[in-house]
Amino acid sequence: MKPSEVARLQRYLRDKFGTERIILGPKTRKDGSVEVSLGGEFIGIIYRDEEDGEVSYAFHMAIMEMDLPPAA
């Protein structure tokens, strides 16, 4: 991903979730994806897809069961 794409995605996510604590980067990975952090903690990866001239982005976030609060 180009730095301009990363900056646009970061602004979109910050606006959508209402926080400036979301950070993308620091740089694009070899496969064209970029890491997403919230307050310094890694939370997921954004993948870029281009098909038939249209670009889309997929955000993947894995949640470990041990990180969840106890069941009620």
Question: Which residues does each PLM region occupy?
Answer:
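Terminal leader/tail segments of proteins
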Residues: 1-72
